[in-house]
């Protein structure tokens, strides 16, 4: 927990969400289109970049500018996972990693994936989509920019 980050401290001790995937990052770019805007986020690992789509009103309300610290939220059902990276090329965001755990239910599976920086990504997939996944498998998680939620202190 970085002591210099008020956002990190508050979210760690008081913010609770149902989003299984939560990462700290910094805004590196934002366009100013009149309706839907695109925001580039550099995660705290210093290498992973995400594309986020938000409304112009959200961008204004959150005062998103370059250098602003944010908390990135992504619900597990919004993440797809594939063994073939070419399947993910149409998505705005792709993250490579290794499957570390699979909890197989009757209809859904929870898949945990280790990212290169050691953080965990969680996806819930229909059982049929997880049938060819096993622990130790190298995979690509992918999702579109409009699935990502940004939280920040204003």
Q: Model segments located where?
A:
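Canonical phosphoinositide-binding patch of PH/PH-like domains
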Residues: 122-124
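Short aromatic-glycine-enriched beta-strand elements
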Residues: 34-41, 105-112
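Short, surface-exposed loop/turn motifs at beta-strand boundaries within globular domains
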Residues: 18-20, 34, 45
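Glycine/charge-rich catalytic "coupling/switch" loops of P-loop NTPases
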Residues: 1-24, 29, 49, 56-103, ...
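Amphipathic alpha-helical effector-binding/dimerization core
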Residues: 44, 53-56
């Amino acid at each position: 927990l970085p002591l210099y980050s008020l956002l990190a401290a508050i979210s760690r001790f008081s913010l609770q969400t149902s989003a299984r995937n939560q990462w700290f990052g910094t805004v590196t770019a934002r366009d100013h289109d009149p309706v839907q805007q695109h925001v580039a986020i550099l995660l705290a690992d210093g290498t992973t970049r995400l594309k986020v789509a938000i409304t112009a009103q959200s961008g204004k309300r959150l005062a998103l500018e370059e250098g602003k610290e944010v908390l990135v939220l992504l619900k597990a059902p919004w993440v797809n996972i594939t063994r073939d990276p070419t399947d993910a090329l149409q998505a705005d965001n792709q993250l490579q990693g290794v499957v570390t755990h699979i909890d197989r239910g009757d209809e859904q599976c929870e898949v945990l994936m280790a990212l290169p920086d050691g953080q965990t990504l969680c996806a819930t997939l229909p059982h049929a989509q997880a049938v060819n996944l096993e622990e130790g498998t190298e995979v690509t998680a992918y999702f579109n920019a409009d699935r990502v939620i940004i939280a920040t202190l204003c």
